[in-house]
Amino acid sequence: MADNSPLIREERQRLFRPYTRAMLTAPSAQPAKENGKTEENKDNSRDKGRGANKDRDGSAHPDQALEQGSRLPARMRNIFPAELASTPLEDFDPFYKNKKTFVVVTKAGDIFRFSGEKSLWMLDPFTPIRRVAISTMVQPIFSYFIMITILIHCIFMIMPATQTTYILELVFLSIYTIEVVVKVLARGFILHPFAYLRDPWNWLDFLVTLIGYITLVVDLGHLYALRAFRVLRSWRTVTIVPGWRTIVDALSLSITSLKDLVLLLLFSLFVFAVLGLQIYMGVLTQKCVKHFPADGSWGNFTDERWFNYTSNSSHWYIPDDWIEYPLCGNSSGAGMCPPGYTCLQGYGGNPNYGYTSFDTFGWAFLSVFRLVTLDYWEDLYQLALRSAGPWHILFFIIVVFYGTFCFLNFILAVVVMSYTHMVKRADEEKAAERELKKEKKAASVANNTANGQEQTTIEMNGDEAVVIDNNDQAARQQSDPETPAPSVTQRLTDFLCVWDCCVPWQKLQGAIGAVVLSPFFELFIAVIIVLNITFMALDHHDMNIEFERILRTGNYIFTSIYIVEAVLKIIALSPKFYFKDSWNVFDFIIVVFAILELGLEGVQGLSVFRSFRLLRVFRLAKFWPTLNNFMSVMTKSYGAFVNVMYVMFLLLFIFAIIGMQLFGMNYIDNMERFPDGDLPRWNFTDFLHSFMIVFRALCGEWIESMWDCMLVGDWSCIPFFVAVFFVGNLVILNLLIALLLNNYGSFCTSPTSDEEDSKDEDALAQIVRIFKRFKPNLNAVKLSPMKPDSEDIVESQEIQGNNIADAEDVLAGEFPPDCCCNAFYKCFPSRPARDSSVQRMWSNIRRVCFLLAKNKYFQKFVTAVLVITSVLLALEDIYLPQRPVLVNITLYVDYVLTAFFVIEMIIMLFAVGFKKYFTSKWYWLDFIVVVAYLLNFVLMCAGIEALQTLRLLRVFRLFRPLSKVNGMQVVTSTLVEAVPHIFNVILVGIFFWLVFAIMGVQLFAGKFYKCVDENSTVLSHEITMDRNDCLHENYTWENSPMNFDHVGNAYLSLLQVATFKGWLQIMNDAIDSREVHKQPIRETNIYMYLYFIFFIVFGSFFILKLFVCILIDIFRQQRRKAEGLSATDSRTQLIYRRAVMRTMSAKPVKRIPKPTCHPQSLMYDISVNRKFEYTMMILIILNVAVMAIDHYGQSMEFSEVLDYLNLIFIIIFFVECVIKVSGLRHHYFKDPWNIIDFLYVVLAIAGLMLSDVIEKYFISPTLLRILRILRVGRLLRYFQSARGMRLLLLALRKALRTLFNVSFLLFVIMFVYAVFGMEFFMHIRDAGAIDDVYNFKTFGQSIILLFQLATSAGWDGVYFAIANEEDCRAPDHELGYPGNCGSRALGIAYLVSYLIITCLVVINMYAAVILDYVLEVYEDSKEGLTDDDYDMFFEVWQQFDPEATQYIRYDQLSELLEALQPPLQVQKPNKYKILSMNIPICKDDHIFYKDVLEALVKDVFSRRGSPVEAGDVQAPNVDEAEYKPVSSTLQRQREEYCVRLIQNAWRKHKQQN
C-alpha cells in the first residue's frame, strides 16, 4: 500500500491531528457523551475490551506502547507525517481522550506527553515561550547535549577536587539550571499531570541543582555529596541502543514488579528478626572469664570487686593465634571454656565491631538479612551455635530455606518473566518493522509499475533488493540467462584469489585437497591440538632447563604444523574459498599471531603475544560437538550478553561514583578507627577502589565492606550497600539467567550433533585400511556398515530406556522376563526342554523369586534394613572405640547385612534375570554394593584394614528407595535426567577455565611467595626486597596456599574465585605480586584486578548459571510428564488441563451452623465478623511491635512495662479464645491457626502462674516467645487484598511440597557425605575452619558443617584443614595412634564433588521449582483461573448449599451465576447463557457443582479468546455414587419448547372444536 494512498491519509488524519485551542475545552464535554454509552456497552467492555488496555477486572489503564518516553509502534511510525514532528498533537492514547493532555512526537518517533493546563499558572500550550521550551526539550540534540554533559561531569567526579574542578562545577551547574528552566517552562512545575516534579527522575535533578546553589553560600558538609546522585542520569544513555533499551526496560519492569515480593520479604525478615531477637538477645556477648582468685590477690569477694575483676579484658580467655575473644556456651554441644574459666554473658562488645548481634531489633533485622543473602553467614552461624548449642541449627535451616531458597528465587522468577515479556515485545516490534518494510517494497514496486516504469526486482542475500532496468536485464540474460554478469571487483577478486591457472596446478590442488580435507587429516589435527593444549598446561613454576626446552621445542613444532596446515588448505581451496569458512579464518589468525610471537620472541615487553597461544585451545571446538554447540549458541546470543554486561558495568560505574562521593573522605579522615590504623584494601578513596568494592557487593559480598564503611561513617552505608546488592546481585545477575533461558535452550536440552562422530569413524576406517596393507592377518577385522539414522536413534533410545528403567518397570509384569540376553541363547542353543523337570523347577524358582521381589512388604523390609544400616554407619564416629558394646553390634550387623544383601541380590537375579538386572542402574548399584561387602568381608578376615571403607558404599543404596517415595519421583528423575547435561557443562566449564588457568600460570606462577617472620606476618619490601635478603635475615620465604604455580593449583584457585570463598586473599596476592623471587608490594600490580573481573564474568556468572538453565528446563519436562501432560500440548491446553484438575479435586465445604442459644449466637456473630478479625490483626501487630522493642540491657522499669503490656495482650487473646470457642464450639479446632492460638493462650497463662516451675522443669520462656511469634503468621491471611502477594503466596503454597522433597534429597546427600566425612576426616588436626565444634568427629557435627558447605560457605577453610599433609602428625600403628593428617587428593575429590552436587545442582533445583510454579500461577491468573477464583466460587456455592450436599436446585442456578464475581460471573439476564453452557441436570432437578464449575471454566476461556475444543482435553470422570445426570440445560429448554408447542397445538385444537 502506497504512502499516499487514501487509506493511509485517512488513518493519518484520524491519529495525528494538530493540537488546537478548541481542544483545550473539548475534553470537558466528552465525559457526558461517553457516559451515555456506558450501560449500552457494559457487557462488551467486559468481554471484548481493549486487551492490553484493560485490567483483569475490566478497569482501563494507559496503553503501555504509547506511554510517556516510549517510541511509536512500528505501524504508527511508518505513517507518521514528518511535517508534524516536534509539533503538539492531540493525544492518540484512548485512555487520555477525556483528559487535558497533548503529545509531541519527534522524528525518531519518541513520545512526549504534556498537560494542557497552564504552566506556572500563566503559560498555556500556545504561549510562544512555552512552545519554544517544548520544541527545545524534545529535540534529540538537547538530550544528547545533557547526556554528554552528565558523562563529562562523571569523569570529573572521578578526579580529585582542585580549583579547576570547582570552576567546572559552576559550569555544569549553569547547564543543569538551564535544563531545569526549560523543562519547567515546558511541563509546568508540580500541580498538573506530567509536570516537572511528577517525574521521579526530575526530583533528583532539582534537589541536586538546589543543593548546588545553597553550597555556594552555606557549607552543607556531607550533604553536598548528594550531587553524586546526578550520575544516575547517565542511566538514560541506554536509550541510544535498542538492545540496551530492552535490557533496561526489563530491569525497570523487574524492579517495579518486585514491590509485592519485597513486602513479603520484609514481612518474613521482620518475623525472623523478632524470633532471633527473642532467642539470641545477648548470647553473642558470652565469653570465658577466669575464676575469681581465691588467693586474696584481689581481696575478699564482693560484688564490686567481682564486677571490676570480670570487666577486665585481661581475665578473658583468648587463644594465642586468635584476634577476637572466642564465644562460649553453657548448653550441651556449645563451645566449652578451658579449666579455670566460666562462661558468662554481657562482657565485651559483640563481634565484628559490634555490628553482629541480636541485641536490638535493628541489628537482628540486619543479621537476618545477612543470613538470607548468605553473605559471610557462616561466621554468624558458627558464633550462634558455639554460644547457644547445636540444636539452634533449626533456626538457621528455617531462615535459609524460606528466605534464601524460596523468596530470593521468587526474585529470579519475576526477573525472568519481565525479561521474557520485554524480549517478546521487542521481537514483535522487529517483526512488525520487517513486515512494514516488505509492504513498503511491494507498494513501491506496484507504484512504479503503475507509472509505466517496467522494472524487475532481484533479491540479494535475502535482505536488500536491487532494481534493474529491463534493458540491462535483457542484455545480461544474453550472456547468462540466470545470473548477472560479475562486476570488475568480483572479476579482480576471482583473478587474485581463485587459483585455477593451469591443469597441473589444479591437479596439485586436488592432491593436496584429498589430504587436508580427509577425515584422517582432521583427526590428526585434533590430536595435535590436544597435545598442544597438554604442552601449554604443563608450564609451571621452577621448571628445569631441560623441561623448559622441551616445551619451547614443542611450541615450535606445533606452530610449524599449524602454518603448514594453513598453507596447504589455502593451496587446496584457494584464498577465496578458504576464508569463507569462519573456522579457517580463526585458524589463520592463530597462525599470524604465532608467527608474530616467534618473530618478536626476544624483544623485551612484547611477550603479550605469548598469551595469544591460548586461542589455540578454542580450535578443539571444531572437533568437539558439545563445545562447538556451546560456542555457536554463545556467538548467536553475543549481542544480548553484551547488552547485559553494558548495563551491569554502567550500574557499577554509577554506584562507584556515588560511593566515592558519599564515603570517600570518611576513610581518610577516620583511618585511625581501623584495628591496625591502616587503610583497608576495600575502600572508597578513589574510583578504582570504589569500583572494585561495588563489584564485590554485586558478587554477593557486601556485609564486611559495609562494616568498614560504618566504622568510619554512619548508618547511611546500610541503604547504599543493600541497594547495590539488590539491584546488582538479585536483579542484574538474574537477568543473565533469564538471557540464558531465552537463548540457551538448545544447548541445555538438545542432543549434540553427531557429524564429527561420523568423521571420526571415517578416520578410524582409514587407519584400519592402512594397517591392512601392512598386516594381511587383520582381514578378520570387519567394520560394521553404517546404520541408517533411524536405526541409530531407535537403538540409542532403547539403551537409554534400559539405563533409566526403574525396578518397578522391570517388575511390572506378571511373569519374570527372559533370564539372559538373546546372544546367550544363540550361543547355547542346547537347553533343557520346556516340559522337563529341570526346566519346570527352574521356572518355579524364578516364579517364587519374582513374586517375592514384587511383594510390597518385602520391598519395605529391604528399605527398613537400608535405613537401619545407614543409621548404624552414622553411629560410627570418633567415640566408637570407647563403646565396646556398639563396636560388637556393628561388627555382627556387618556380617548379617553381608549375608542379607547377598541373598537379596540372588533373589533379584532370579526374579528379573541377568539381562534386566545388568541393564538397570539401580540393580548395578546393588551389585556394586554387594561386591564391596564381600570384598570388605574377605579383607576383614585377612586382617587388611586399608580397604575396609568399601562397606560405606552401602549408604548409596539410600537413593534407590528415595525414588519410590511419593512425590519424590519428579525430583529424582530431574536429577537423573540432568546428569548427562550437567556433565557436558562441567566439561565445557573445565575447558573454558583451562584458558584462564594457563593465563594465570603465565601471569602469576612463582609470584605469590613472600617473606614472613616467626608470627607469619608479611614483612615490608623495605625490610627484605627479595628472596635472598629474606633467607639472609633468617626469615621464612613461603608460598601462599592458593597459587598459580601450575595448572592444578590454578584450577583450585579459580574455583575459590568462582565461588567467592577465599578469593580476596588470592586477588590480594595477585595485585601485590612483582617478579619471581621478589617481595610483594601492596597494590603495585593493581590492574591485575581485570584478570579476575573477566574470569568472574565469563567463568562464574556465565558458566555456572548454565546449571540453573538446565535444571529449570528439565524439571519443567519431568513435571509435565508426571502430571500426564504432553510436551506437544499448546499453552492453552496446559492451562485448561490444570483448571480441570482443580475443578475435579475441589469440593464444597459445609458452613458452620449458627447456635440457637442467644449468648452463643452473639459470640458466633462476633467470631465471624470481619471487623473483629481486623481488630485482632491490629492487636497482633501491636503485640509483635512490643516484642520488637525488647532489647538487651534494658532497664528494670522498661522490663516491667513490657511485662504489663504482655499481660494485657494475654488477657485480650484469652478473651478472644473464649469468644471463639463459645461461638464456634468444636468447629473452632478445625482451623490450624485456632489450635496455635489456643495452645499459646494455655501456655502463656501457665507461664504466668508457674513461671519458675515451667522454666526449670517443663518449658523455657524462650519457647513461649516462639509460640507467640507464630501468631504473626495469621497476618498472611490479610494479604488477600493485594493480588500480587496472593499470587506469590499461592505459588509458594503449591511449590512447598516439592521444595520439601528437594530438601529431603539434600539431606540424604548430606547424610552420605557425613558418613564418608567421618570415615576420612574425623581425626584431622584442628586448623582453618575445623575446630572443637565444627568438625567431622560425630555425625551431628558433620551435618552441621555440611549444611554450611551446601551453600559453599567457608569451604576454603575446610579444605585447608582436610588437605593439611605437612603441619600434622603421621599415624603410629604400634601405639594405635590414627594420626591427624589430611589428604590433599581426598580433600579435593570430597569437597569439589560435594560442591557440584549441592551448590550447583540441588540448590539450583529450588530455583527450578520456584520458577516453574510462579510461571504457572501467573499464566493461570492471566489466561486461566486462580485459586482465589475457586475459593470465591465455593464461598458463593456455600450460600446456596449450606449443608455441602454438592447439589443445588436448577431454579437457583441463575442466582448463583449472578452472585459470583468476575471472571466467573454471568450477569442477568443469563437465561440463554445457561442454555449455551449445556450443564447436566441430575434427578430431582439438581445441579452438580463440578458440572457448573467446568462449564464456567470453559466459558472463561472462551471469553478470553482461548476457546478449548471439545476433543482437546478430556475431563476426568466423576465417580460420585449419587451422580446420575438425566438431562441438561439445553435439553431441558428443548423439552420445554416442545411442551409449549404441544400445549399451543392442543389449545388451538380445543378452540377449533
Swiss-Prot record:
Positions of region (Linker region that may regulate channel inactivation)? 1133-1146
- Please cite one Gene Ontology biological process associated with this protein: membrane depolarization during action potential
The record lists glycosylation at N300, N308, N312, N330, N683, N1015, N1028, N1034
Q: Describe the function of this protein.
A: Mediates the voltage-dependent sodium ion permeability of excitable membranes.
Biological source species: Periplaneta americana
InterPro entries xref list: GPHH_dom, Ion_trans_dom, Na_channel_asu, VGCC_Ca_Na, Volt_channel_dom_sf
Question: What's the protein's topology in the membrane?
Answer: Multi-pass membrane protein
One Pfam family here: Ion_trans
The disulfide bonds in this chain are C288-C337, C328-C343, C709-C717, C1011-C1030, C1368-C1381
Protein localization: Cell membrane
Q: Where is the composition biased (Basic and acidic residues)?
A: 34-60
Q: What is this protein called?
A: Sodium channel protein PaFPC1
Q: Where is this site: Interacts with the spider Mu-diguetoxin-Dc1a?
A: D539, D542, M543, R549, R613, Q1002, R1027, H1032
Give TM segment ranges: 141-159, 166-186, 201-218, 225-241, 261-280, 393-413, 520-538, 550-569, 584-603, 606-623, 640-658, 720-740, 858-875, 889-907, 922-940, 946-964, 982-1001, 1087-1108, 1172-1189, 1201-1219, 1232-1249, 1263-1279, 1299-1316, 1388-1410
Could you list which ranges are intramembrane per the record? 361-385, 687-707, 1048-1069, 1339-1361
Residues that coordinate or bind saxitoxin = E378, E704, W1063, D1356
| Regulation of catalytic or functional activity | Inhibited by the pore blockers saxitoxin and tetrodotoxin.
Segments on the Extracellular face: 160-165, 219-224, 281-360, 386-392, 539-549, 604-605, 659-686, 708-719, 876-888, 941-945, 1002-1047, 1070-1086, 1190-1200, 1250-1262, 1317-1338, 1362-1387
Lineage: superkingdom: Eukaryota
Please list the residue ranges that the record places on the Cytoplasmic side of the membrane: 1-140, 187-200, 242-260, 414-519, 570-583, 624-639, 741-857, 908-921, 965-981, 1109-1171, 1220-1231, 1280-1298, 1411-1553
